């Protein structure tokens, strides 16, 4: 774009008769352009001009008699003076000669001249401050001789850099004030003139004045007001609805100030045409955008303005034979607006590329309209206009030059669009196609292949099938013309040309609509496959349509199946498939595959049953669907974020072989074990089972349990068939539950192939029953007192029996106290409601502290009992026919529904009502989940009815409960309990001495009267197989109290097995008095175990 279009600078002239300006130029360049000029508009708002360029013009360019808009704002006269004689003889006459030229009114226009003359006195000595004229300084002398002209000092030599900066800062402020003052005066003058003109009907003069206002605002960079003035000009022009000729397009287009005439002047001359009007407003609007800060918004605005101008001219002058030439030169001119070094901004690259593409397409249209040259697949609308393109003849002197210029232009545009950060990928592909078609047209087939390789795939994938098909046909033809091209480089990998060609044939089959064309390309595809046997992956969509029935069912024992509807419409005939696979993936990333082999896929609709022998249960999302035909794998990959999921349930089948893993029913206290049971094991030929412990979610670093006590073992394998296996494990963390992954692989005797199952099993490893024990010693009897409670507050326990067995090594113990319930007892967590079970143990021989007894407790949790009752009594209700339908879903019922039920145990305990807690289960979600299964309606309905009943509450009696839970297998906990270690043990008895009357019944005991008793102390160590100690090592003592006075042998040594002595007890209180306490200690003062038979007896004293 020509430089003259940029007019945003304030003109300032200088007259330099002494050739001083060049020494001052660096100083002026330091302060220019002026910055931060504040102008207060008439409405009171303050506008800030951040940057105001100043154009310094030698006085020679300002000598002519000009109007205000052509005159400088300031006129400088630069002089110096070092003596009185020089001032009087040369300087003063020169100033007086210069001043008469500064007329107040233009002689040619009669317009008042508004500018400011300033004398610049150049001095690098003290002459300015010295009094050359005795009483006044040189500056004062200038002021006295020329009072109406401002005189300013300028210099180029300073005492310091700081002085220099301060001096020119002050000078800059004075120039700002002068420029602002002249701007304000000119603005006021023009506005007054316009106001006066609006009173009359002189439209042309009003228009001229508005144009001057616009120019003044532009010069001073007040762009908002300039834009408003331009809009007013346009509004006035349109309002007058002037008749004007079309005019001629300016070829070549000029945007210089010489061609940018005043609109008012043109109207006065009567030469205005439509082209001049379009150009006038375009140039001025573009000028305003040019003066704005060089932001992306300004560039986008300029680009839109240029496009709109081209569109307007194209419509207005569509019949002009010079239209294409005009557009070419116009766009060339406008491209200079976007010339920057090292352009890297994507938006600027995009704008420039768009303009270049407009220029190229216009040029191609001009060439094709005026010559016989053609480009493949490049067409323009037919036109009756015989366009001229003579000025650009050298760009297409022959077809080779034409194609080379087209290629150069396209590559330049392509390079710019490639810098747009992928925003214009479609245009990049289109341009690449055009280059490829040019190569193909020039029989440069290898170059064409390299370009088309990615382009046609883009169009077929974006459903631009018509374009994709054409390019594809050209690509195949180009590749067919390259017999030596065996390998192509695609994304850095080497791919055989045959594979690429096979892929292209499939693309053709996808895009072809008529069957005849499909047959031709299908034959070519089959011939190529027969010759090369290519293996590749290809998208399934476009050739097949897949619809899934998301409900998985059991095809036969150990085989799950899913139904698929497959429509084949991409091939002209039936095709034989080798394999079809549907892959599903769960949240953990595990994949299961349903498949079918050797299936004849008919053209049109097909219904398939895909089977899975290596099954896994849970919720799965669709991963992919594959069909293998003639070595080609057609794949449909499903998106990761999808709402649809497929539930693979565990369906029960009597004939199915599987391995069940659960917590062992019979456990010893402190022991942890699993039970592995092989179902239908007699049908197995081989069996491999892997039990793997999963890390807990709360502690992913460590394993919760190990299968070895000596080392951490997370995996256990079995490689031979079995019926039942007990697998012990050891806790490594404080947990109540953990997860196992059970992987089973097996073959059957009467069925070919390998079967497998992978399932996740949750093991509850906490003990549901809490057992504590106390021991009680008596003279000839020993008691165990067991207290039983539920170990978890939320999980009551049902107790069936409690039996204590003697050690296997002895049979002379007599045990009494076994508990066998007629109606199971309900045990809770509450310690105040413990179930107490006492056992009386006597020994024919001695007790042995090494002997270990076993308490065997048979129990279930209340939830297990209620689950059983709900299943048998509420759900099945003895309906055999319905149970046959339900049986295959009983595993799903147990794992997915029963496990989630939470009962109101308080309601059951108090009123024998089975009812679910409100937070137990969401019936709507459960209903929705069940409907995703291929479950029969009769089964579904009854399950929902059952859940509704239990949600409301069901009253039961003990008889019904006992009857329906007979099939519930009790758990058994064996608690080993050992007799306490040997301690010295004594039996003490107060035996009343014989009198003529029974002292306790026939005589009245009164306070102060003694009562006679024989105290018998027996050492019972013999009952524990220990020798009696007779060395006096134990001391017997009757303890004093405030109730009794002891008379007799109160304290003595125990030296024999049995000792008897007499004491007299004198009561000191009335009422019921307990016998005195006794104590036996060893010589170290430690108390021994004593069985005091009178400890809880009392005597009534009167």
Curated annotation (Swiss-Prot):
Pfam families reported in the protein's UniProt record: Ig_TR130_2nd, NTS_TR130, TRAPPC10, TRAPPC10_1st
Gene Ontology biological process terms in this record: cytoplasm to vacuole targeting by the Cvt pathway; early endosome to Golgi transport; intra-Golgi vesicle-mediated transport; macroautophagy; retrograde transport, endosome to Golgi
Keyword terms: Autophagy, Golgi apparatus, Transport
Stored InterPro entries: Ig_TR130_2nd (IPR056915), NTS_TR130 (IPR056916), TRAPP_II_complex_TRAPPC10_C (IPR022233), TRAPPC10/Trs130 (IPR045126), TRAPPC10/Trs130_N (IPR056913)
Keyword Transport: yes
Gene Ontology cellular-component terms listed: cytosol; early endosome; trans-Golgi network; TRAPPII protein complex
Main location group: Golgi
Keyword Transport applies: yes
Places the protein is found: Golgi apparatus
Additional facts recorded: Present with 432 molecules/cell in log phase SD medium.
Similarity-based family: Belongs to the TMEM1 family.
Role according to the record: Specific subunit of the TRAPP II complex, a highly conserved vesicle tethering complex that functions in the late Golgi as a guanine nucleotide exchange factor (GEF) for the Golgi YPT1 GTPase. TRS130 plays a role in the YPT GEF activity of TRAPP II in concert with the two other TRAPP II-specific subunits TRS65 and TRS120. Required for both the cytoplasm-to-vacuole targeting (Cvt) pathway and starvation-induced autophagy through its role in ATG8 and ATG9 trafficking.
Quaternary assembly: Part of the multisubunit TRAPP (transport protein particle) II complex composed of BET3, BET5, TRS20, TRS23, TRS31, TRS33, TRS65, TRS120 and TRS130. Interacts with YPT31 and YPT32.
This protein's name: Trafficking protein particle complex II-specific subunit 130
Species whose genome carries this gene: Saccharomyces cerevisiae (strain ATCC 204508 / S288c) (Baker's yeast)
Name of the encoding gene: TRS130
